[in-house]
A protein has these predicted regions:
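Extracytoplasmic/cell-surface-exposed regions of Actinobacterial cell-envelope-associated
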Residues: 1-10, 40-41, 81, 217
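Generic structural motif
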Residues: 4, 15-19, 39-44, 210
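Substrate-binding/active-site clefts of carbohydrate-active enzymes
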Residues: 42-219
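Compositionally biased low-complexity segments at domain edges in trafficked proteins
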Residues: 22-49
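Extended acidic/polar, glycine-enriched regions
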Residues: 1-27
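Generic structural detector for well-ordered beta-strands
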Residues: 11-15, 35, 206
Length: 219
């Protein structure tokens, strides 16, 4: 680029990818993606449906309860998924959701580093990804940087008072999603959708806090 009559050249090398590196091409328009909810898909290990220390127990008679699907069930059906022509499988979040109710969907995370034991273990997830890859199927990891679960340990002692939007007090959004893309939307609607919580069980992370932003980037 040029600046005040000066020219500066910045050089950087394009190196050969290291064997076995994790830097791979992502998904795109060429892919056929299967989006599924693991708890509702297939139960390959009934022994982990309900576990000590996890208050939301399996109950197939309850529409909002857990139904027992897990990584073992997903792994058992990879041949079927590949045979249907899918090139990518996108499970909803698999991280721990130790919420009192409605933990099946995975979007109220209480441990950002641990697969929910009712789905399996971190090692089970690695094996699932490897098994999918062996069949030519990629795995999209669903992560949730917008919010956490209300039972997350942070909610017992927030790192900073403004770690959560509205200082940890539930403030629902009106879900005016188009306010973010509508050039004529009212500022109050943009603010409401940006800072409001989806539901009381999903405290909204304040990404304007530089420590929150740094945590999300690094982790």
């Amino acid at each position: 680029f040029e600046r005040a009559g000066e020219t500066e050249t910045i050089r950087y090398p394009l190196r050969q990818r290291a064997p076995g590196s994790a830097a791979r091409r992502g998904f795109g328009p060429r892919d056929v993606i299967l989006n599924l909810m693991p708890d509702r898909y297939a139960d390959g290990d009934p022994a982990n449906d309900s576990l000590p220390g996890y208050t939301d127990r399996a109950d197939r008679a309850e529409p909002g309860g857990r139904h027992g699907g897990d990584l073992a069930g997903l792994s058992e059906r990879l041949d079927y998924i590949a045979g249907m022509g899918y090139t990518m499988v996108w499970p909803t979040p698999l991280m721990e959701n130790n919420q009192p109710t409605h933990s099946y969907h995975g979007y109220a995370v209480t441990d950002l580093y641990r697969v929910d034991p009712r789905f399996g273990s971190n090692d089970d997830y690695r094996r699932f990804v490897a098994a999918a890859r062996a069949r030519g199927v990629g795995v999209i990891q669903d992560i949730v940087p917008n919010h956490i679960g209300s039972a997350h340990p942070w909610m017992q002692d927030l790192p900073t008072p403004d770690w959560i939007n509205n200082r940890g007090v539930f403030q629902p959004t009106r879900h005016a999603r188009n306010a973010l893309s509508d050039p004529y939307a009212a500022a109050v609607d943009r603010e409401d959708f940006t800072r409001g919580w989806f539901v009381a069980s999903m405290p909204d992370l304040n990404q304007r806090n530089p420590y929150v932003a740094n945590f999300l980037i690094q982790h």
